[in-house]
Amino acid sequence: MVEEREPLVPPAVADGARADALANLAFLRRPSSMPHAEWLSDWLDRHTQVAIDTQGTFGYVQNPVVEHLTDGGGDVTGIVEELFSMTAMTDQHAFYGSGGDQEELERRFTTLMDSCARFGAAEGLDLVPTSRYLFSL
């Protein structure tokens, strides 16, 4: 079971329609050496803005895991959905929002990776490129 936060609210789409976006899902694992409260605060309170500022995202949804409902997934402590333009699949400048500036791309990449390393997201991270659909249930 997860909680949901939307620091950067994704654009609305019609029921059942695909969003015009690359939706990257990132499955985060907390390092065993880092207390849960510290990890959660570092991810939600510090890293969030770094991720938004260093990537070309137009939707950013965080899902802290509050309870594991099945066996086998207990090491995942957070799930992030980041929305990018479709061009971000093949263009690093679109992915990082660097506008074609190589130095800016490198600065953004380094800043993001340093931030990820601080709370353990530089290791054991699973990324799944996918699409975003919303359905009324």
Language model features: what each stretch is:
Residues M1-L137:
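Macromolecular interaction modules
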